[in-house]
């Protein structure tokens, strides 16, 4: 089974070797047909403590590292400003 890759923004880097990433998804409401935004926070492993608050990163699913960490930071993505 392939590993999931998500993209989100770092909202906390206070813990050692851990960042909290806010991932937002958009979907169409089945009844109202309106675009709805939903967000979820994931705790990801950052071995070198290189990512700071506000960075946009990609995280990949991995084996459990601790009680709450099941994701690892893959890379930092450059935001495209339109």
Curated annotation (Swiss-Prot):
Keywords: Ribonucleoprotein, Ribosomal protein, RNA-binding, rRNA-binding
A single BP term in Gene Ontology: translation
HAMAP family with a match to the protein in the record: Ribosomal_uS17_B
Pfam family, one: Ribosomal_S17
Protein name, as recorded: Small ribosomal subunit protein uS17
Keyword rRNA-binding in record: yes
Function: One of the primary rRNA binding proteins, it binds specifically to the 5'-end of 16S ribosomal RNA.
GO-annotated molecular function: rRNA binding; structural constituent of ribosome
Cellular component aspect of the GO annotation: cytosolic small ribosomal subunit
InterPro entries (alphabetical): NA-bd_OB-fold, Ribosomal_uS17, Ribosomal_uS17_bact/chlr
Subunit (UniProt): Part of the 30S ribosomal subunit.
Matches recorded under CDD domains: Ribosomal_uS17 (cd00364)
Gene3D superfamilies xrefs: Nucleic acid-binding proteins
Membership in a protein family: Belongs to the universal ribosomal protein uS17 family.
């Amino acid at each position: 089974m392939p590993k999931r890759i998500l993209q989100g923004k770092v909202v906390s880097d206070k813990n050692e070797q851990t960042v909290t990433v806010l991932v937002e998804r958009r979907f169409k409401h089945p009844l109202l047909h309106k675009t709805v935004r939903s967000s979820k926070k994931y705790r990801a492993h950052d071995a070198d403590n290189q990512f700071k608050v506000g960075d946009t990163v990609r995280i990949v699913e991995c084996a459990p590292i601790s009680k709450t960490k099941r994701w690892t930071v893959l890379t930092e993505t450059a935001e495209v400003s339109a």
